Amino acid sequence: MRAWTTVEAGERLLLLRSCCAADAEFASPQGVTRGLEAFSGSIGAFLRSFPRAEVVAGPPDAHNGYVRVRWHTRFNDGATNPIFGDDFIEFDGDMRIRRVVSFDGSAADA
């Protein structure tokens, strides 16, 4: 989750390389990316769109090589419309992230 709060692109890419397969896929309502540079770019786009947002993750729920993480944003400027979501994470045989499928919505959707 640290990658989701890391603004500097080079540092974020290093974080992703430490835990993800080189061909990791990230699928969200905004589209699908493949590869760590594209994954990092998607995170960077999120951080640029919501510069005062902190992503807060709940405890992971895991079974059979899959993990679900529920998360929400917290805005340090007092904004009252957080984003809520669920990420479903698949690991490869080396326990590196192979795929993240993200579902998100506003508090009004929850």
Predicted regions mapped to residue ranges:
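Short, aromatic-enriched amphipathic alpha-helices that serve as compact interaction elements
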Residues: M1-A9
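Bulky hydrophobic/aromatic packing residues
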Residues: W4, C20, T33-R34, W71-T73, ...
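Soluble or luminal CAZymes and related metallo-dependent hydrolases
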Residues: E8, A38, N81
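Poly-acidic low-complexity segments
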Residues: E8, R12, G105-A107
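A solvent-exposed, acidic/Ser-Thr-rich amphipathic alpha-helical stretch
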Residues: E11-G65
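A beta-strand edge to alpha-helix "cap/lid" segment located at domain peripheries
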Residues: G41, A45-A110
